[in-house]
Amino acid sequence: MDLEAKVKKMGLGHEQGFGAPCLKCKEKCEGFELHFWRKICRNCKCGQEEHDVLLSNEEDRKVGKLFEDTKYTTLIAKLKSDGIPMYKRNVMILTNPVAAKKNVSINTVTYEWAPPVQNQALARQYMQMLPKEKQPVAGSEGAQYRKKQLAKQLPAHDQDPSKCHELSPKEVKEMEQFVKKYKNEALGVGDVKLPRDMNTQGPNKMYIPGGDRSTTTAVGAMEDKSAEHKRTQYSCYCCKLSMKEGDPAIYAERAGYDKLWHPACFVCSTCHELLVDMIYFWKNGKLYCGRHYCDSEKPRCAGCDELIFSNEYTQAENQNWHLKHFCCFDCDNILAGEIYVMVNDKPVCKPCYVKNHAEVCQGCHNAIDPEVQRVTYNNFSWHASTECFLCSCCSKCLIGQKFMPVEGMVFCSVECKKMMS
């Protein structure tokens, strides 16, 4: 790709969703404007998924690329125009007759995603077993939840080098090898079935859930098992509770069909969120979302949110950073060798801290320098000096003394408090 095409592509990426309102900050945000290398809005610091941006096509491309060159190609289709793989997301529309006084109206419910099973009743049953606030009904809280989890769990920059910021040719090659490896060894999609339907494993054979994976027995030998025994032999791999007969379960092929999960228990072992669209990564007996699987394999830059493929990076405040991305969260100035303050787990340079985040002294009404001692009570702060931490009535210095706080004032005695009341 030549330089002009690269610049054009980057420009289009930054134009996507430009000006969209923030659903979290409301009117405090002037509208979405993508930061040059951080994956956040320059105005409010929230992610794109927190803004009212239509991303369905972009997300379908992202998931389509994830499934490319895997056994899950049946879940994608390539556009004739550009050959880009698109996720064939299964949308489920349910129509329920609603009786009115004079006639019958039709109530339609659209799920933006549903398990790709032929039995719609099974898919509907699966949805009903999810928390209502996480059911992806179009226009609902659940649809917004799914949108956020697609962005959080499956970052495009964890699989596509073109979505990353200034990778070297060596880093691009390493990333491509990493993606190929996790597609071959960890990536999977959950399968929704009734546990009893998973018994058949080959002609005249029945699989025993919970036993050795190679254990089989003749069908005839199982026919005398009681219904009660069949119910108790199935338990959720996550919560360990028994599965109710007739309820759908989720299987993960990479985990083996001796393990199954309740729909609401099919979650990432790190963030404990529902695995979006049942897309999972399996490692050492645990389910992960894409983000946290990658975090278990590679360091992630706390500045740009990308995986680090360089041998040289810095560690600070229990986080990892590209050398060029250990910058002030407010002004983007590089912090190497500079004084900084952590604000909400983000490093901020001293000038920006004093300007934007510092507490204001109730005595002199100036910002309190981060390196200066202070006195704090509730939400009020003072310089710990003889000029600032004084009785609000008689100006007696209160450092090391007992005091009586009243909102933003402090008093040395009851008498002084009464005189000011």
From Swiss-Prot:
SUPFAM superfamilies: Glucocorticoid receptor-like (DNA-binding domain) (SSF57716). It is found in: Cytoplasm; Cell junction, Focal adhesion. GO terms for cellular component: cytoplasm; cytosol; focal adhesion; plasma membrane; protein-containing complex. GO terms for biological process: negative regulation of cell population proliferation. The N-terminal and the C-terminal halves of the protein can associate with each other, thereby hindering interactions with ZYX. Belongs to the prickle / espinas / testin family. Residues 234-297, 299-359, 362-421 form the LIM zinc-binding domain. Keywords: Cell junction, Cytoplasm, LIM domain, Metal-binding, Repeat, Zinc. This is Testin. The keyword Zinc applies. It comes from Bos taurus (Bovine). The keyword Metal-binding applies. Interacts via LIM domain 1 with ZYX. Interacts (via LIM domain 3) with ENAH and VASP. Interacts with ALKBH4, talin, actin, alpha-actinin, GRIP1 and PXN. Interacts (via LIM domain 2) with ACTL7A (via N-terminus). Heterodimer with ACTL7A; the heterodimer interacts with ENAH to form a heterotrimer. It comes from the Eukaryota. Residues 133-164, 193-213 are annotated as: Disordered. PROSITE patterns: LIM_DOMAIN_1 (PS00478), LIM_DOMAIN_2 (PS50023), PET (PS51303). Its main location: cytoplasm. Residues 92-199 form the PET domain. Scaffold protein that may play a role in cell adhesion, cell spreading and in the reorganization of the actin cytoskeleton. Plays a role in the regulation of cell proliferation. May act as a tumor suppressor. Residues 155-164 have a biased composition (Basic and acidic residues).
